């Protein structure tokens, strides 16, 4: 019987959540892409075909693929879920009480397929057929968004992350992504796959403003044996790490959290853009984060709900200790310094492990893939000329929901 549990980064992957890029990407333009956290606009049809190849590769490895749009449609079929989502996404504070009421009424009358498409992909004022007495729509331009598109939903890794016997519903750093978490809150609460199942919601499920306690799943590596590795990047804060760690310890789901301070720039957006776990003793690492000046801490439960925080000198040694290994096999990004920088930018280090020693990655990263092959790692390559321009690889685009221990 399947279960909602992720025990490692490298054990057999059994179920995963993806989101095929569709309507949201059609709303990306050169003038708004940076606000929506993209560096460029993508060819939507080509990106969809590349994503299909990714999903098919997973299925060929025996992995069950769940698609976010399908889960949203099923969830919206539950009246309580639909009402909750419309209330939180179309709030009086966001739109004003008059326009929020009119917009909720219009959306509530849509069929669930169309509504899911709008909530994920956005809606412009020019596409809105209703009239409202509110001042707000009269002050907007036709191409302004009534509902902003969520192109970053492509990266299902970030919005929620499963850690051992539970899930963190992550308070996202950037406003362009904060609505995403509510979709996962609804799915995990009401969708038939999850409703009534025995799993823990560690963090982010309350109707709270989490202030500076931000965490994103791309920074969270479940390295196994009760250990969790978390990067403090430009998107994940120490406050977020400590809150998640406290809840993991409170529920007895982790024995330690290793936290690494990452350089705060775009190429190190998340830990998994510079480091991924490929086999029990093997990691892919971009050389920049092998510097000795990166601060590292080890968080452990101290009893009575308190934590001990210990400064460490070397995060790689901390990983060895956590996994009971004498030595880690580190594979650095391939090519000379120019090639390595280019391939890291194109997500060479952001691979998804489907079972020990077998990973999925972009075919374009030829130098790094060659290094993986020589080290005994099998790379199942997928096209990524368009998807890669979104600055996310196979790990970014996947949220494991069921994975074996190591």
UniProtKB/Swiss-Prot annotation:
Q: State if Hydrolase is listed as a keyword.
A: yes
**Where does the chain cross the membrane?**
none
Q: Which Gene3D superfamilies match?
A: Arginine deiminase (1.10.3930.10), L-arginine/glycine Amidinotransferase, Chain A (3.75.10.10)
Protein family per UniProt: Belongs to the arginine deiminase family.
What EC number(s) are associated with this protein in UniProt? 3.5.3.6
Q: Which keywords does this Swiss-Prot/TrEMBL entry list?
A: Arginine metabolism, Cytoplasm, Hydrolase
Q: GO CC annotations?
A: cytoplasm
Organism of origin: Vibrio vulnificus (strain YJ016)
Leader sequence range is: none
A single Pfam family it belongs to is: ADI
Q: In which pathway does it act?
A: Amino-acid degradation; L-arginine degradation via ADI pathway; carbamoyl phosphate from L-arginine: step 1/2
So where's the catalytic machinery, residue-wise? 396 (amidino-cysteine intermediate)
Location in the cell reads: Cytoplasm
Output the Gene Ontology terms for molecular function.
arginine deiminase activity
User: Which taxonomic lineage is given here?
Assistant: Bacteria, Pseudomonadati, Pseudomonadota, Gammaproteobacteria, Vibrionales
Record-linked InterPro entries? Arg_deiminase (IPR003876)
Instruction: Tell me the name of the encoding gene.
Output: arcA
HAMAP family in the cross-refs: Arg_deiminase
A Gene Ontology biological process annotation?
arginine deiminase pathway
**Which reactions does this protein catalyse?**
L-arginine + H2O = L-citrulline + NH4(+)
Q: What is this protein called?
A: Arginine deiminase
